[in-house]
Amino acid sequence: MGEQAGGWRAARIAVSLACRECKSRNYKTTKAPDQVVSLKKFCKQCKKHTVHDETK
C-alpha cells in the first residue's frame, strides 16, 4: 500500500495531535512529509469530540 515500485517505503514523520480547544496533546501518529494532519478525535480533557491538529 505505501510501497514504491523498488520495494522501499517512503519516510514517515512522527507527530503529536493536539486538541484545538484545550491544546492538550492526546494522540501520536505518523504522516508523510508533505501532508498536513487534522483529525476529529475524542479529547479526554474536554470530554467531547474535537478537531486535533498536528504538532511536532
Curated annotation (Swiss-Prot):
GO biological process terms held by the UniProt record: translation
Disulfide bonds: none
Pfam family, one: Ribosomal_L33
A single MF term (Gene Ontology): structural constituent of ribosome
InterPro entries: Ribosomal_bL33, Ribosomal_bL33_sf, Ribosomal_zn-bd
GO CC terms in record: cytoplasm; ribonucleoprotein complex; ribosome
Keyword terms: Ribonucleoprotein, Ribosomal protein
Family of the protein in this entry: Belongs to the bacterial ribosomal protein bL33 family.
Protein name per Swiss-Prot or TrEMBL: Large ribosomal subunit protein bL33A
Gene: rpmG1
